[in-house]
């Protein structure tokens, strides 16, 4: 029944029936833990891989001994980095030792290896002042994968791929003649026996003896024209290195370096783990019949007798006593199963070796050698440590290759199984740490080359580590990764939920991943292994659907990069659900039968029903209680955070829920956030983990609270913790970040207590929208096609008002003609335009500005013209005339307006770091209050989105019997066909809850049901169907039928009409085609495309069509004449030849075709080569519009790019219309696309 739950400072009435076992993990630990691992272990691994660097003679030996990140010498804090456009990083210092073997001299030095970007507490990086997130990548795990296809004759053909982390691939395939081929590193295919011979089984007899009798093997041997190991080696060498003279030695070393050299071939820990898992012998012999006695080689004891069935435990015992070949009986044939000879070290070493921390299987022959040669515990441990890379090889070994071939042979006897590439057991996550590690490794290996070269060139006596090491390649590869990798993304900061989701995103794209074009349907589809690991709902619509996913709420990532989800263990003896929680990967989960979390159990954990609904792999079954092994821990463990915030998700169609999840991330933070009346109970957790809210670092008492600072006296030592609050800061997306304290003076706070609310949070709960009184009713056609009718009250009372902050910057540079100057003294500008400019030439804070107003006054020196003799004489007499300057001030762009909230000034004199050539940098921040208006996009949480069609006066809105007018009217037809019934339930429950004064939590898949809602309505005194009589506000008459009315949570999305509305008369033109540019950012025109031309043709509107194709587009002279005619009020002249026609003729001429243009009388029409010839007759210039909108370059993506823009701006700022005649202008250079 409904019960109160405390969420932060608010009490919610919860409808959940299930007791949740286990806590949700910290929602951004994916980022934090991974980066942490990188700093602690990942960096060390890379240095270990590269150690030692030797010169070509092997005399000099350079090794990296240790490293530290110098956290004390971080230059700027996170806030300062954002302000100064710098990177939040710490210097990486590495201790390097150089050994000269001839002289035995050792030199040690600490070498600075560049600044290393640090992760902030929120899981982000500050790169060049912009906050970025590194998205985790889902890739195919290294390992062995088997696949099966059926050919025309119906026979099964098996293929395999051996994928390392880096190195050469091996691919096996069978053709319809039963011949097995291998491709080495994507080259042409060879019979597989050639590979077996090259690896050591040279003759036909040896191959058959080792792999056992098999038709496919025999067929392959017949096809194979080599007969000895040497021939096979030469054959492989010819294929891999065509055109080089083959010798046996070079072939041997080629194969060695391709597969058995740890520097070239890396399986990684995951790869080794997956290999041992797949190729272990015990999996293939379990439940098979032994064809010979199986004897323990150490003791001589018979483990399994001939003809006996091998059970699971016996199979594991067989493997762990070092047996690698087992004969089993299949359809009266004997088949030999070969493993890769890895064993569990703990079963063979007679004492405790937990301190060695070996989790993987180890290679048996090496272990046996150690155990045979050493007896006492210490020396065995010492030898194991020494030989760890032989015990757990990082590269593939011969035994692995033999086992893969044997597995391939066994598949046709139904021994082993084929793999599903889309299963999450075969896909792993590369998070920040690993991506960085790979990048760092690339940088170090480039550096290694340089070091080797310097070792040979420089004098070996005086050489120092510092002189050998060039850190450029390392620094460059890190910089490149953070700056331009596909996985390093500009953080989506629209609201706290979008930040959180961005950090939890999983992408299958990026380097080493898939590409949009190649990704088929299977990769994108929902898979049974996604359950509890990846959300089946939240993914973008469009070309990336299914390639970009979101981590589920309870999911964690294990040390190998596989995603795990938690389950409750069911006690095997008495079948009772315990509170033990086990995290399982997808392939572990496949071995068990798992019950649903809402399966009824009593208070002691016993199942109430005899039959239980369970999941087993991809099937949903009903089984007796005795078979259940695990149980889900929560109904919301299968969805992501955004999806878990949709109440009544279970009543929505999946495609609408997808839109709901995605649109919550686009909700703009409002002026006064309001938590939802009907929530799901996860809002608090999401807000606290998103990192936007300040928390108390220590327990204590609040001693001071103001709008921008909170001070807490610590209980431990009486010291004071200060917390600065952010006020009206600009987010990456231009929304407003503003924090408001929620504690009061004297309040006692525990550690981790929230001290303030941020954007879109209310008492620590995420609050993306507003609770609005709405009804499902049509109104005069204003709800047609998802339009929304809203009341003027929402505008008057600022219900949906949001603050948006834009940043504009001006820089004063050195130009060829002298430095630019920021000044109040601007040519041809009246005092009126300078009323808010201070004496430095910069706008004052608090000024109200409109489009075209000056923000920063700036003048640029103009080119000096050649002076005539008279002028020179006058100058000589009257002294130097003031140098010519032109006005290049920063102005408010077209269509923007607001209030200046902040101005930042950076100059060389104050010691600020500025880009080369820049003397002064000014940034102005303009804030706008945007009220809700017609054309804004709004949405509920159930994918019910719409655009505002009309703002109606309050008195005309339909009203309730108690006189309250509705705030929004929605179209009832938006519900049935879209099947998002959740919105109706939300409205009913919202109506009851607002009357009862409750806030409600109805968790997904475990929330209120119909009867609960009816009870609440009854309790609140409403009728059970939730409908009420509604009166027409214009006439006061009741509407014919009763109407569903209630409270719905509605969001205002970041698609605001002010950002989209756009109009142009004249403006910039493209350089080559001379057609208007496109898009609002370029102040472009509307495209009149092919189909639109057909429409005019269909109506025979010849003049309109001619006008559109010429003077409104690219007839350069014609458009100037037309403008002139309009200004003078004359008739519009005949259009000329469009520029694009001239471009076409030039293209044809480039193809060596001589093209002439003829008129009706077959007279050639001369096309003028340049516009200048036409230009003489013109008097008006429309090229420079009055104030040419400077491209408002989004500061968004990369700040480095801004240099390119600025170079262009100086030369291309358009002059004023009145000042110049067209002759002064070189028309070709006009308004080029920046």
Curated annotation (Swiss-Prot):
GO terms for cellular component: DNA-directed RNA polymerase complex. It comes from the Bacteria. Residues 1169-1234 are annotated as: Disordered. GO terms for molecular function: DNA binding; DNA-directed RNA polymerase activity; ribonucleoside binding. The RNAP catalytic core consists of 2 alpha, 1 beta, 1 beta' and 1 omega subunit. When a sigma factor is associated with the core the holoenzyme is formed, which can initiate transcription. PANTHER family: DNA-DIRECTED RNA POLYMERASE I SUBUNIT 2 (PTHR20856). This is DNA-directed RNA polymerase subunit beta.
């Amino acid at each position: 029944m409904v019960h109160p739950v405390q969420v932060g400072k608010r009490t919610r009435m919860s409808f959940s029936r299930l007791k949740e076992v286990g806590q949700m993990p910290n929602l951004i630990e994916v980022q934090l833990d991974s980066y942490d691992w990188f700093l602690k272990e990942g960096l060390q691994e890379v240095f270990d891989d590269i150690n030692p660097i030797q010169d070509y003679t092997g005399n000099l030996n350079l090794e990296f001994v240790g490293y530290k990140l110098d956290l004390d010498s971080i230059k700027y804090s996170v806030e300062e980095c954002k302000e100064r456009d710098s990177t939040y990083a710490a210097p990486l210092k590495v201790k390097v030792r150089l050994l000269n073997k001839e002289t035995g001299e050792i030199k040690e030095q600490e070498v600075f290896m560049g600044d290393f970007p640090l992760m902030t507490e929120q899981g982000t990086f500050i790169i060049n002042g912009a906050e970025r997130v590194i998205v985790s990548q889902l890739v195919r795990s290294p390992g062995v994968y088997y696949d099966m296809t059926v050919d025309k004759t119906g026979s099964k053909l098996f293929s395999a791929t051996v994928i390392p982390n880096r190195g050469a691939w091996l691919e096996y395939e069978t053709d319809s003649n039963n011949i097995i081929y291998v491709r080495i590193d994507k080259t042409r295919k060879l019979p597989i026996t050639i590979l077996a011979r090259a690896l050591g089984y040279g003759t036909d007899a040896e191959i058959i003896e080792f792999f056992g009798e098999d038709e496919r093997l025999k067929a392959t041997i017949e096809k194979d024209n080599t007969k000895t190991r040497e021939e096979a080696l030469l054959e492989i060498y010819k294929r891999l290195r065509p055109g080089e003279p083959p010798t046996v030695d070079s072939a041997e070393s080629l194969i060695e370096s391709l597969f058995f050299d740890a520097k070239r071939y890396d399986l990684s820990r995951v790869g080794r783990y997956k290999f041992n898992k797949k190729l272990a012998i015990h999996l293939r012999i379990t439940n098979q019949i032994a064809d010979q006695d199986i004897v323990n080689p150490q003791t001589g004891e018979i483990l399994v007798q001939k003809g006996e069935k091998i059970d699971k435990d016996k199979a594991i015992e067989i493997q762990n006593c070092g047996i690698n070949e087992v004969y089993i009986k299949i359809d009266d044939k004997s088949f030999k199963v070969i493993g890769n000879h890895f064993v569990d070290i703990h079963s063979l070493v007679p004492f405790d070796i937990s301190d060695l921390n070996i989790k993987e299987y180890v290679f048996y022959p090496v272990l046996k050698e150690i155990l045979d040669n050493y007896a006492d515990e210490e020396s065995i441990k010492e030898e194991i440590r020494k030989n760890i890379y032989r015990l757990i090889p990082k590269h593939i070994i011969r035994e692995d290759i033999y086992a893969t071939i044997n597995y391939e042979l066994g598949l046709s006897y139904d021994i082993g199984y084929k793999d599903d590439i889309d299963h999450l057991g075969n896909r792993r996550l590369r998070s920040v740490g690993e991506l960085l590690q790979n990048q760092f490794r690339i940088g170090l290996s480039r550096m290694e080359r340089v070091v080797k070269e310097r070792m040979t060139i420089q004098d070996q006596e005086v050489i120092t580590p510092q002189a050998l090491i060039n850190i450029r390649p390392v620094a460059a590869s890190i910089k490149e990764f953070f700056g331009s990798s596909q996985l390093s993304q500009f953080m989506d900061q629209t609201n706290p939920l979008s930040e959180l989701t961005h950090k939890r995103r999983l992408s299958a794209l990026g380097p080493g991943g898939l590409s949009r074009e190649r990704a088929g349907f299977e990769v994108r589809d929902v898979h049974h292994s996604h359950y509890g690991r990846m959300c089946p709902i939240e993914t973008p619509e469009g070309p990336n659907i299914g390639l970009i996913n979101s981590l589920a709420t309870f999911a964690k990532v294990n040390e190998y990069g596989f995603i795990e989800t938690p389950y409750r263990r069911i006690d095997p003896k008495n079948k009772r659900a315990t509170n033990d929680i086990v995290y399982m990967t997808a392939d572990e989960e496949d071995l068990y039968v798992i019950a649903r979390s809402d399966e009824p159990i009593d208070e002691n954990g016993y199942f109430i029903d005899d039959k239980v609904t369970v999941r087993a792999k991809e099937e949903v079954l009903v089984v007796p209680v005795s078979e259940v092994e695990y149980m889900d821990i929560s109904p919301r463990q299968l969805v992501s955070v955004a999806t878990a915030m949709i109440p009544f998700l279970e009543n929505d169609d999946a495609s609408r829920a997808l839109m709901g999840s995605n649109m919550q991330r686009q909700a703009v933070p409002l002026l006064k956030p309001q938590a939802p009346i009907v929530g799901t109970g996860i809002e608090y957790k999401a807000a606290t983990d998103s990192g936007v809210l300040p928390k108390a670092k220590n327990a204590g008492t609040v001693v001071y609270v103001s709008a921008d600072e909170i001070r807490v006296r610590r209980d431990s030592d009486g010291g004071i913790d200060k917390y600065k609050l952010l006020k009206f800061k600009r987010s990456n997306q231009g929304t407003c970040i503003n924090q408001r304290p929620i504690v009061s003076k004297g309040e006692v706070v525990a550690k981790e207590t929230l001290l303030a609310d941020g954007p879109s949070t209310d008492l620590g709960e995420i609050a993306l929208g507003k609770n609005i009184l709405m009804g499902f009713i049509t109104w005069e056609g204003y709800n047609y096609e998802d339009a929304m009718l809203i009341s003027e009250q929402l505008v008057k009372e600022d219900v949906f008002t949001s603050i948006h902050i834009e940043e504009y910057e001006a820089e004063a540079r050195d130009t060829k003609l002298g430095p630019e100057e920021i000044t109040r003294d601007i040519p041809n500008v009246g005092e009126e335009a300078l009323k808010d400019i201070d004496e430095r030439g910069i706008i004052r804070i608090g000024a109200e500005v409109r489009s075209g107003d000056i923000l920063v006054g700036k003048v640029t020196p103009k080119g000096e013209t050649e002076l005539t003799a008279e002028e020179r004489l006058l100058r000589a007499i009257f002294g130097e005339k003031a140098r010519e300057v032109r006005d290049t001030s920063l102005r408010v762009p077209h269509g923007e307006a607001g209030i200046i909230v902040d101005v930042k000034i950076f100059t060389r004199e104050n010691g600020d770091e500025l880009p080369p050539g820049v003397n002064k940098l000014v940034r102005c921040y303009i804030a706008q209050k945007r009220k809700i208006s017609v054309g804004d996009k709004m949405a509920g949480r159930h994918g019910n989105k719409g655009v505002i069609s009309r703002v109606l006066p309050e008195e005309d809105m339909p009203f309730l019997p108690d006189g309250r007018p509705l705030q929004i009217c929605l179209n009832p037809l938006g519900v049935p066909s879209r099947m998002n019934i959740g919105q109706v339930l939300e409205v009913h429950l919202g109506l009851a809850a607002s009357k009862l004064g409750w806030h409600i939590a109805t968790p997904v898949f475990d929330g209120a049901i119909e009867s609960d809602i009816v009870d609440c309505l009854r309790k609140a005194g409403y009728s059970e169907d939730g409908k009420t009589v509604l009166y027409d506000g214009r006439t006061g008459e009741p509407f014919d039928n009763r109407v569903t009315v209630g409270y719905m949570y509605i969001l205002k999305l970041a698609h605001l009409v002010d950002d989209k509305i756009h109009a142009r008369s004249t403006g910039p033109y493209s350089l080559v085609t001379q057609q208007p540019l496109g898009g609002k950012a370029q102040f472009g025109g509307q495209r009149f495309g092919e189909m639109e031309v057909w429409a005019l043709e269909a109506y025979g509107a010849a003049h309109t069509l001619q006008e559109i194709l010429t003077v409104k587009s690219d007839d350069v002279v014609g458009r100037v004449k037309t403008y002139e005619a309009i200004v003078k009020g004359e008739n519009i002249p005949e259009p000329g030849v469009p520029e694009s026609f001239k471009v076409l003729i030039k293209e044809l001429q480039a193809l060596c075709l001589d093209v002439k243009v003829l008129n009706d009388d077959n007279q050639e029409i001369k096309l003028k080569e340049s516009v200048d010839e036409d230009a003489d007759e013109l008097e008006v210039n429309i090229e420079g519009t009055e104030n040419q909108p400077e491209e408002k370059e989004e500061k968004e993506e990369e700040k480095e790019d801004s240099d390119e823009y600025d170079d262009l701006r100086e030369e291309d700022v358009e002059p004023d219309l009145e000042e110049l005649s067209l002759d002064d202008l070189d028309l070709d250079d006009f308004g080029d696309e920046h």
